[in-house]
Amino acid sequence: MASSNLIQQLQERGLIAQVTDEKALAERLAAGPIALYCGFDPTADSLHLGHLVPLLCLKRFQLAGHRPVALVGGATGLIGDPSFKATERKLNTAETVQEWVEKIKRQVSPFLDFDCGDNSAVAANNYDWFGSMNVLTFLLDIGKHFSVNQMINKEAVKQRLNRDDSGISFTEFSYNLLQGYDFACLNKQYGVALQIGGSDQWGNITSGIDLTRRLHQNTVYGLTVPLITKADGTKFGKTEGGAVWLDPSKTSPYKFYQFWINTADSDVYLFLKFFTFLDLAAIDALEQEDRASDKAPRAQYVLAEEVTRMVHGEQGLAAAKRITASLFSGALADLTEDDFAQLAQDGMPTVHLERVADLQQALVAAELVPSRGQARTLISSNAVSVNGEKQASIDYVFDDADRLYSRYTLLRRGKKHYCLLNWQ
């Protein structure tokens, strides 16, 4: 992705929501490598899918020869960004935020190259400059450059001020100053000339541009990526179980993979542009192939493979595909003990049973049927599988061969209703 047409390529992928002085930024990028940054506040112990587009945008710039700075908000994470939030965030302790900072730094690292010469990535933490700053320095060196009139007219703040049920605290109101100063600090330390972020960050970004000009007399730029919405209007990156996280202990590679497999046809080609590095010609060709085929679209599988590999590596992708194939075919021999643990983690209904139990008892305990009578009916109708094998004996009692890894048995009612038995 050459610098000379990087902005154009981002536009073609739909990755630019707003940009300050697009022509001047394009000329600056064409003139040579720049440093740019994106901030990630530790508001949880993991990044989620909403962070992925700006994070991948940093990577796109690095691939074009520019130097990315990943800023983790050890200070701003203590305050909480009020932008377009209906109520004030719950404040977390310094110890909790510091723990989350370290986790997020580890999550960001695999996406960027920290050892590639002049455009090696940098990891920064804004607690380094805010942690020892006293209130007088803050007011004199930063506060005097901000107009309260302008701050309260920013859309993100205005929405909170206009709500009858909640206002905005001075703590959150100050967030805009902190993020603005981040830009000025990074401009001085690393020559950062561009900040990228989600479109909800536009007000904070423009504040940083103005403060950098006032403090250092430097011209810098801002670019926002769109907040992702689905074609049906529902929120992207959420499932019935909540957010889709990048941490495999919070959202397993299998569940992550399934999230992308279930992408609607109306969204999948756009998401390939947002979340993968496939060139546009390949994405267009895939779309034409899918439209001409009478088979299920291939795009969802391409998307799921590309993004799962990027986030969880080849091993995570292999596990996700193995579990998917085994559940679909009913052949469980290829599943590892860790795969079964993933299924339990992902929320597959799991019940703990004593070693002596029959199939009827297990079906009732698993809440696949309400009674033994209905269990007998279901078994007789050949609608129950034990580890992928149909079981038609109403008197069936489990034996050691049914306990995979001496611990797990997978029950299925019909085609879609599963329960994992965990033997004591």
Curated annotation (Swiss-Prot):
'HIGH' region, short sequence motif: residues: 42-51
Domain of life: Bacteria
One Gene Ontology term, aspect cellular component: cytosol
Record flagged with keyword DNA damage: no
Signal peptide: none
Record SUPFAM superfamilies: Alpha-L RNA-binding motif (SSF55174), Nucleotidylyl transferase (SSF52374)
Gene Ontology BP, a term: tyrosyl-tRNA aminoacylation
GO molecular function: ATP binding; RNA binding; tyrosine-tRNA ligase activity
Motif 'KMSKS' region, chain ranges: 235-239
Entry EC no(s): 6.1.1.1
Catalytic reactions of this protein: tRNA(Tyr) + L-tyrosine + ATP = L-tyrosyl-tRNA(Tyr) + AMP + diphosphate + H(+)
Location(s) in or outside the cell: Cytoplasm
Swiss-Prot/TrEMBL keywords: Aminoacyl-tRNA synthetase, ATP-binding, Cytoplasm, Ligase, Nucleotide-binding, Protein biosynthesis, RNA-binding
Main location: cytoplasm
Coiled-coil annotated spans: none
Keyword match tRNA processing: no
Family of the protein in this entry: Belongs to the class-I aminoacyl-tRNA synthetase family. TyrS type 1 subfamily.
The protein's name: Tyrosine--tRNA ligase
Organism: Sodalis glossinidius (strain morsitans)
Lineage: Bacteria, Pseudomonadati, Pseudomonadota, Gammaproteobacteria, Enterobacterales
